[in-house]
Structures are given as structure tokens and as C-alpha cells.
Amino acid sequence: MLTRALMLTGTLLASTLVDAQVFSRELGDFDLKLATQPSRSMAQGLVKPTIPGSTFHGGLDLTHDSGWYVGQWAPTMGIKPGTNLEVDSYLGYKHPFDQTLSYELGMIHYSYPKLSPLDSQQFYAGLTVLGTRLGAAFSNDPNRHDSTLFADLGVNQPLGIGVSMKYTTHQLGTPVSIAEGGSVRAFNDWSIKFPRPFMGIDLNLIYSDSSLEGAQCSAYSGQNSQCDGLVTLKAERAFY
């Protein structure tokens, strides 16, 4: 079911030196980065190793000239009530053939030292061909598996509008019962985004939906903000 909703979100992102510090140094064939902001994204930039609502950002990233990289990140320190310490470690390999073709492979391990049974892994791969980015990720979480396909088609000229898409299949280890009877064991969700910069503001028109509807939405736990179809217009501007 498509919910006829238009959400307008205006976000002003204020950045300071305190929350955007990056220390970088070359160590022979290695490039070391220590940062309080994410210094890397995976699968050709289509996978983000962070989570919403993080209370602390800090970590290191070490890259070798051969294309191998390794790093560790603490997206949350468990300071706020109801949150737990999380330490993410990743290992990957990125190789460009030329300026138009490159690929990337890797794995992220999500660790919760105080909640060890919740540890999980995410495997990812990405390919860039003539400005188009394609990616895939598979998450092996406790009691569920998520498989995601990404596509970023780049910017269409002369309009300057980009197109990116995401499609995810969710398999639940334990079926979720719904009020009207029956249960949900698997579902899909997807989103398509049209970004465009305008006078220093990043505009994003996003449509998202899922395969669930009606009472089934009580079992939704996917990537979108809600189960039903939603159109969102988001405006962001960063001040430095």
C-alpha cells in the first residue's frame, strides 16, 4: 500500500574542527589516518560503516599502496542510556584498472564486547564502470540475514540530477507473528534517490517502499524509515 505522504526535511549540518578532525601521515608504503569522522566508505562508496544516532566517532584506517586496507572504528561508546559499546573492524582490497574501471572487496566485523552473542559480519563488493557504481552486501546478523544490491548511475547532464537505488532482501530467523494471524519470515524493501546540488544545498528526492502492507508492517525492521511507500524531500547544507 502506498501512503500518500510527502515529508520535507531541512537539515543544517554545522561542522567544527572538533567534530571533523582527521590526522593523516604516510608511513613508507602505508597511509595512516586517525579521525573523529568516518574516513572511509566501502564497496566503491556504497556501504557506510556507521550507524544513525552514534554518540562518538573515532578510529583508524591503514592503507597500503597495493590496495589492501584495514581499520577499526567505534561508532558508539555506550555512554548514553540504552546504548552499548560497539567496535567495528574491517579488512578490504581496492584495485583500479584505470580511471574508468575499478573493483573492491572486503568484510566488516561488528563487535559488541558486552553483548558478544550479537556480533555479526558484513561482506561487500563494489564495481565502478564508466562512472556507474554497482555494489552488493551480505550481512550475517544473529537471527537474520540481509542481502543488499546498490546502484549509483552517476549524474545526468545537463540537468545535474543523480540517480541511486538500493534493494534489500531480509530473511528472519524467527518468524514475527502479526495481529490478524499468520507471520512474516521474509520481506523486501527498496529505495530510489535523486540527488541534486542547488546553491550550496544538497537536495535529495527519495522514494521508498516495501513488500509488506497493512498489519504486516508491524513486523517491518528494514532499511527505510517506514514500511509503506513514502516520498521524502531532504535538504542539507554543511557550514564549515
Residue ranges of predicted features:
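Detector for outer-membrane/organellar transmembrane beta-barrel domains
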Residues: 25-26, 119-182
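Residue-level signature of outer-membrane beta-barrel architecture
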Residues: 60-64, 93-95, 127-129, 136, ...
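Short glycine/proline- and aromatic-enriched beta-strand/turn motifs that initiate or cap beta-hairpins
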Residues: 20-77
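Solvent-exposed loop/turn segments connecting transmembrane beta-strands
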Residues: 46-53, 77-86, 110-120, 138-149, ...
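Outer-membrane beta-barrel "beta-signal"
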Residues: 130-131, 192-200, 225-240
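Outer-membrane beta-barrel pore domains and translocons
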Residues: 35-41, 73-77, 94, 108-112, ...
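Repeated loop/turn-to-beta-strand initiation elements of outer-membrane beta-barrel proteins
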Residues: 66-72, 99-105, 131-136, 158-165, ...
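Cleavable N-terminal export/targeting peptides
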Residues: 1-29, 239-240
